[in-house]
Amino acid sequence: LAQSFPASDRTWAISLTASQVIYAGGGVRSSVKSSTLVRDAAELDLKAAINDALLGVRTAFYGVLLSREKITVQEKNLDLLQQQLKNVTDRFNAGTVSSFEKLRGEVAVANAKVPLITARNDYRLAIETLRQALGFTTNKQESLRKIPDFIGTLDYAPVSFELQSAFTAAQVNRPELQRLAKLTSAREESVTAAKSGAKPTVSAFGGWQLRKGGTNSFSDSNDGWLVGVQSQWAIFDGRATAGRVSQARSVLEQTKLTLTEAQLAAEVEVRRAFSQWQQATELADASKLVTGQAEESVRLANARYNAGTGTQLDVLSAQVDLTTARTNQLQAYYAYNVAVASLRKAMGQADEFVTN
């Protein structure tokens, strides 16, 4: 017995093929390395942005501490002037001083209230600056007028730095320089990848194929395996490969120039930060000594005035000098702490809060 199947006007085929590049003139490997280096460069760029943000937050926090301490200085100044006014008023009532001295004391007290009001407003503004640096926002009604409490004081803790060591640390640790070094290596790999266009490529392939015949019988089909090696080589491409190589080399040279420029900028930043640190150190040491002398001057002026050998002008002048000395000391401590943080950042060191 025989069975026949009618002819069909449809044929179909299934083909599964896999290939693997064996040799591509180093292009594939260079492309993978280049992509990895670019990814690493992006991570270093993020690290640099984080360092900048942390420095901004630390500087803003020091600004809050400075503004808060200035309020204390102005409050102490006002308290001393009020005590002096009370002393003058008592003497005026006793008839030992003129109304002029009493009036002068009242004017001094009134004038002392102005910088206190300014200091309190500066404190509120410093908090807003810190809030912006932190990216902190709140729409709660109860928090709009609330002033947060800040822990810490504006202290002077001497730290030693050496200029040559700072240069070395900056060249090694700065994420901006590391990023450009990664990009330079990536551009070198891009040149290698571009050169691979002038070299042959060799690939191994294998596959399986099923082809259906021209009848409705499923047995009317053929299938089989295929394994082989193939090669391609663009002998002439209108100098397209040469153009890509030239372009890749141009980008490489631009990246190298950018790296050199960044290294010079980092060196200048280290020098500037180191100079500011030196200045801040000298000012902090000097202001500490002057404040002690100004406090002693106020004590002696009050003693001489109470003994009748000094004048009210001596007391007021000494008090002004003390307030100026205390303010300068706070400003010097603030400048020193900011200078240390800026120098650490210029050297590529992470913020102390991160390292600790």
Question: Regions from the language model: what does each represent?
Answer:
Residues A49-A169, A273-Q276, A280, L322:
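Periplasmic alpha-helical coiled-coil/stalk elements that build and connect Gram-negative outer-membrane
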